[in-house]
């Protein structure tokens, strides 16, 4: 699986995720505006955080 990886204001890069079957994109509102995080897997999130998990290469753009 190849996913985009990103922490808030950084530019997204691609990464290989051995053994993973999902990529995710999660976003929430913070004091600086909308915060976006991308990565491998499909983590659990707290209330108020939107998450989209997907199952194809680079699907979390």
UniProtKB/Swiss-Prot annotation:
Principal location: secreted
Database matches in InterPro entries: Snake_3FTx, Snake_toxin-like_sf, Snake_toxin_con_site, Toxin_cobra-type
Key word Coiled coil present: no
Gene3D superfamilies in UniProt: CD59 (2.10.60.10)
Lineage: Eukaryota, Metazoa, Chordata, Craniata, Vertebrata
Coiled-coil intervals, chain numbering: none
Keyword presence, Signal: no
Superkingdom, taxonomy of origin: Eukaryota
Family to which the UniProt record says this protein belongs: Belongs to the three-finger toxin family. Short-chain subfamily. Type I alpha-neurotoxin sub-subfamily.
Keywords in alphabetical order: Acetylcholine receptor inhibiting toxin, Disulfide bond, Ion channel impairing toxin, Neurotoxin, Postsynaptic neurotoxin, Secreted, Toxin
Molecular functions per Gene Ontology: acetylcholine receptor inhibitor activity; ion channel regulator activity; toxin activity
Organism: Naja annulifera
Reported tissue expression: Expressed by the venom gland.
Protein function: Binds to muscle nicotinic acetylcholine receptor (nAChR) and inhibit acetylcholine from binding to the receptor, thereby impairing neuromuscular transmission.
A single Gene Ontology CC term: extracellular region
Name of the protein this chain belongs to: Short neurotoxin 3
A Pfam family it matches: Toxin_cobra-type
Cysteine disulfide partners in this protein: 3-23, 17-40, 42-53, 54-59
Compartment(s) of residence: Secreted
Signal peptide (from-to): none
